[in-house]
Design a protein with these regions (language model features):
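Terminal presequence/propeptide segments associated with secretion/organelle targeting
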Residues: 1-204
Length: 204
């Protein structure tokens, strides 16, 4: 309040800093929550998306080490059960009118049945199974890319990563506004209370 009164009294150009910061924090909050839900459900709860992504990385680079490390503790039969639960949970946490496109696929082809979707995915994909995946990676490079591009897991991977990237873009946009506001606030407070001890703005 004292700061606001000082701005009004002195005519300093800092009147919008606090309202703008408040608005930026409010606007970033849903994107932060949705990013966390995506991570907890599709990038760590169920492991098939990350496995599929690393399969594409290995296909491009020829380096299979990280992919092999993932398979060490991976249980496809368990993930087949986990994936439907994660898809169902995630849908309740995201805006109904803005979902990853895989939900449209599941609704149209499987009547919204996540379990049926997971059963078909695991039955027709090579990605969950290390022996099948390594056999594919041993093929001619063009054949590898073609096989993985047509693998059903990649549709899920692309859906999740495209959506995640769109959320991250918005999050970073608002985070930039927050960091800018914090720098401006530091400068304003330095004028408002020039003798007050405060941390360096090196981190702002």
């Amino acid at each position: 309040e004292a700061f606001t009164q000082w701005v009004a009294r002195t005519g300093k150009p800092y009147g919008n800093i606090l309202p703008d910061l408040k608005r930026a924090y409010e606007e970033i909050a849903p994107y932060n929550r949705q990013l966390n839900y995506m991570i907890e459900t599709m990038l760590s709860g169920s492991e098939i998306v990350w496995l599929g992504y690393q399969a594409m990385v290995a296909a491009g680079s020829g380096d299979k080490k990280e992919l092999k490390d993932l398979y060490k503790d991976y249980l496809p039969n368990l993930d087949r059960e986990v994936l439907p639960a994660m898809l169902s949970l995630l849908r309740t946490k995201l805006p109904a009118d803005n979902l990853p496109f895989i939900y449209q696929v599941i609704d149209e082809r499987f009547g919204g049945d996540y379990k049926a979707y997971a059963e078909e995915l695991f039955a027709n994909s090579v990605v969950p199974y290390e022996d099948k995946m390594m056999a594919v990676l041993a093929m001619d490079p063009n054949k590898v890319k073609e096989t993985l591009a047509n693998d059903p897991v990649q549709e899920l991977v692309q859906s999740v990563l495209t959506y995640y990237s769109s959320l991250l873009d918005k999050y970073l946009e608002y985070n930039h506004a927050i960091e800018k506001g914090k720098r401006e606030l530091f400068a304003a407070m330095s004028e408002f209370q020039p003798n007050a001890l405060r941390p360096s703005d090196a981190n702002f």
